[in-house]
């Protein structure tokens, strides 16, 4: 007994001290919680920065103090030490690799306990110079591949590499023919060319934060032996490792580069899966972003040219750093109770978990059991309080989780949770009265009514947690109820008064119903209740409460009367099927009634779509039935989509019509070597239901091509060339990997066929060169496709002509006639088609001023077989030389003999002036001063007049040989616009415009300048002869 009493006294003293200290501080005390922890740091050797700072800051009350460990040993701080503590940060002055490289850990402590931070490494970055030794020259046959070894100097961390050609900064670009490995730094040239001659140097760069350092090697000379460059199959030289390890979330880069002539094309594939959107492929490099375990597997790179192919395979193996799935949290536990804590971490390899208490390793002892990720306490004591950490680690990293354990010893206290003072209860109902004092250890609870001690009976229940439950309540149960609580720390009680009210009853319950999708329904619910209390109604569907404000308009209250709780269901959907419960409740009781609503509609989505028996054009699909939604399923349909389109398309099946009791069908007429997803839809008399989830992606098997390439044609090019063009075959029709084209061609009229294989699906032309090919020679050409599974059908034979030759014959009898001051007509006799070695496209007219060279001539081309042309844009009163040439796709032929023309003088620039008009009955007479041509102008042969009633009507042209004209006007004439201009050999002159308004009398416009047109309208009015003339000079 003496030991127990001493323990209780010690516990009371600790509790009183803790409570008093908290009251004095005004806030709860707690152990250190890290807000900033040290991070891995890379310090560049030779940096101008003279210190390194490792950060550490913890939230704690009282504030934490800090210590630091290096490689597990505590660092000593002092005024003369290179280590300083600034708040919680560790500052290392003049860091040196030999002394300071290592692992650092921050330790934070206050009165509540101690925690340690994650470990952070301090490493030193460096890059030494390349070796000073001269590098051997390299000699290779032109057309063959070559590799230059970088052999970088010692360094940390990894470098980036480029190569110099002859001098800085002439860097070699990565252009498909040349490749620089960022793993080794080596330079690869797939096929050497004459332009590759020169001296090569490896240029290595280190990037550490904002500090960049570069070094370059001695130059190595490349010389080429000139020979006829023969073609050869690819050979992969730059390879990614056989096993590439990566952590989840990282980006993986695989390198693959091959020698070959022609330069090989690189393709990537995953042998045990398909390409994903995370792939970024740029031929020699495959980048996979944000890798996960699904990216693990075997990858293949393929190098291919027209001479063959080479492949290489390697695996990507994905590991993961530790990551918490379940961690400990701050816990308050009663003295004498048991506690189990668990920490669970994921990672690959699987992490090991260890435990720390106040920064020190924790092992099993007495009441404490440590078992991997579990920590168990039996019969907690106050001394178990403190800071605990679980640490999960594998070879890729370490994670820490921290929590504070507070062991409590408290006398019962009702101040936070007293028994409710007034406890209303419904007659014949049930009442629950909690008793929840704060106490540690848990208190023993007794209940009394007045002075009567309550015990369990048919109507009275006291639960293990001290809650009092009274059932079948009557008026006699009213009175005072008191809860008494006691533990070894003390005792307390709390009292409430029970008041009995009338029970709530549902007088009209909802009825079950069946409806179709889209219909409306009202579920009825009426109730009676104690008039001294408010009544409310709530509804639930399958025990989930219905929120009328968030029902998208499908639910609403059907009445505002207090005793009526009817629920209106609007535009019912399948999701509205289920068991509806109406609950009428007051503050003291509630009562419920339920009914079932069945909503019939289209079937639900089928489940579990599985693809099997995959062929080249067929697959077998199976699925499981979905909900029929209370209407039998009549039939199924199957849809699919490919990697080429996101649009779902209905597929043909076997059987054609899939009955509603089926759970499997064959999909036919698929495209070979195509990635597909499938989904299944069910339908009944009410419509087509939602589709199933897509199946997993599959790829149909490969097959030989079944369609010949289209768009076969060609022609053009250089002399002695036959160019054959076609439309590249779409992915839909390639049917397999290794796709390409086989061309067959021969001179028309000969027997033997020449063939050529053109790899790559995107190819679209082939050039055949031979000195024996004459110009515009017809060839018979056929094409078919091939892939790894075989060859497809040949196309129909097309006629393609070799390159054309410029016409050898010139047009003749060329004539040119000046039409106006700036225009001429040219005509000629055509060349004979038989004289052409190509297709005549038309004729080219060249014209140049007398005194200019023919090379400066302007040119106009006609299309087709026309033998005349109208040329505009000439200078007036100018002599021109004109010649004509025939042209085709190869160019223009020889010129015809040139002919000469001289354009006429321009028309008079001055418009007609002193215009007057007289309106008499249905005729308007217009007069003007004659225009006299100047010496540099063409003669005046007459006048043109454009007459229109308004700005929207079509004009009428009148011709006059003299300076007056009579124009008939309609009886309803109100006004008109008239333009007058001179005409002659040089064309039409500048117009004058008159606006005529109907009225008796005359009107006149007098020109005020010889050289300038009137800029504004002039309006002239007289008394009874109201006359208006609106005159403007406009150029048509």
Swiss-Prot record:
Primary localization: membrane
Positions bearing carbohydrate: 71, 199, 456, 472, 493, 520, 770, 900, 914
Domain Fibronectin type-III: 605-703, 708-805, 810-907, 911-1003
Disulfide cross-links: 56-106, 150-202, 256-301, 343-390
Post-translational modifications reported in the UniProt record: The N-terminus is blocked.
Record membrane topology: Lipid-anchor; GPI-anchor
Cellular location(s): Cell membrane
InterPro entries for the chain: Contactin-1_2_Ig1 (IPR047102), FN3_dom (IPR003961), FN3_sf (IPR036116), Ig-like_dom (IPR007110), Ig-like_dom_sf (IPR036179), Ig-like_fold (IPR013783), Ig_I-set (IPR013098), Ig_sub (IPR003599)
Any single Pfam family the record assigns to this protein: I-set
Entry's Gene Ontology BP terms: axon guidance; cell-cell adhesion; neuron cell-cell adhesion; presynaptic membrane organization
One function term, GO molecular function aspect: cell-cell adhesion mediator activity
GO annotation, cellular component aspect: axon; plasma membrane; side of membrane
Family indicated by similarity: Belongs to the immunoglobulin superfamily. Contactin family.
Protein's name in the database: Contactin-2
Organism annotation: Gallus gallus (Chicken)
Organismal lineage: Eukaryota, Metazoa, Chordata, Craniata, Vertebrata
Gene: CNTN2
